[in-house]
């Protein structure tokens, strides 16, 4: 009699009656077996991963509702889903509608002008801009860093070359997108807190609202990649048929709040008025967090890395 390689139980058939693992055979050691497993997983449209992705995209709020009600075996966990989508989001190109602020969006018009390239210009509005609410506080950081690096560069080159604000702008912009994507998870606890307050009457655990936030942010990242691919496809058309870049941004601005309404209504089993109010609170919390906290954190982290 053969024993299960996983738990040691004596096997009766091809699968262990105790733990469910398939009987181990010599061919399982070969590379072909590994490839066949990968192919099966990638093409199994009834598998948990693809089933979960379909539900996330086309049935707003269903995954959260199923989690609340304890029906979890058919779906991958909210954390696993978020991590999987995050990996795709992190490695994909950036597109308008994401959360990245480049150097010129983080600083005042004065520093923007100092960081201009030889063939670049700024509008009067851009020059007059005060930047972000915290830009006046962070401007001395940038000035000190550029000054120190300029002195070091001149000392090392005997005065033949230095370090400019434009040099720092390019270094900052090269890192900002990755930092922004890595920090997107910071929105989850804030969104969950907003939902906890909006639906306090349902007496749900904070962890349940956290799950909804994971699902919502997963959809946000996934939909952004779909819009990116749509943009790439439309760019294959003649230039006269290309939609303006702002169209993709407005598509996301419309899609995400609408999705939030349907998701809240299903997940929290509430009527349309409460769903609209809950979705408004969710989106407002994310927007306010972006304006007053997230962008500042993004700047500090990017500054520390550049």
What spans do the regions from the language model cover?
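Membrane-proximal intrinsically disordered regions of secretory-pathway and membrane-system proteins
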Residues: 1-306
């Amino acid at each position: 009699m053969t024993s299960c390689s996983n738990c040691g139980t004596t096997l009766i058939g091809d699968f262990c009656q105790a733990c469910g693992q398939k009987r181990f055979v010599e061919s399982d050691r070969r590379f072909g077996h590994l490839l066949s497993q990968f192919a099966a997983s990638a093409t199994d449209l009834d598998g948990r991963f693809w089933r979960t992705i379909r539900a996330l995209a086309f049935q707003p709020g269903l995954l959260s509702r199923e989690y609340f009600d304890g029906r979890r075996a058919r779906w991958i966990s909210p954390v696993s889903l978020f991590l999987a989508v995050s990996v795709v989001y992190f490695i994909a190109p950036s597109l308008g509608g994401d959360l990245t602020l480049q150097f010129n969006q983080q600083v005042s018009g004065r520093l923007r002008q100092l960081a201009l390239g030889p063939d670049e210009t700024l509008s009067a509005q851009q020059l007059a801009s005060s930047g972000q609410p915290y830009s006046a506080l962070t401007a001395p950081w940038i000035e000190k860093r550029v000054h120190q690096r300029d002195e070091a560069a001149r000392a090392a080159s005997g005065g033949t070359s230095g370090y400019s604000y434009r040099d720092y702008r390019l270094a900052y912009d090269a890192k900002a997108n990755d930092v922004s994507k890595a920090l997107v998870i910071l929105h989850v606890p804030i969104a969950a807190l907003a939902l906890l307050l909006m639906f306090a009457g349902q007496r749900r655990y904070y962890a349940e609202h956290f799950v909804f936030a994971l699902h919502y942010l997963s959809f946000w990242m996934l939909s952004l990649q779909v819009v990116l691919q749509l943009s790439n496809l439309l760019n294959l058309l003649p230039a006269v048929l290309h939609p303006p870049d702002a169209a993709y941004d407005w598509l996301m601005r419309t899609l995400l709040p609408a999705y939030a309404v349907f998701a809240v209504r299903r997940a929290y089993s509430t009527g349309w008025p409460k769903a609209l109010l809950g979705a408004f609170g969710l989106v407002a919390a994310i927007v306010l967090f972006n304006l007053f906290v997230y962008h500042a954190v993004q700047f500090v982290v990017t500054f520390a890395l550049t």
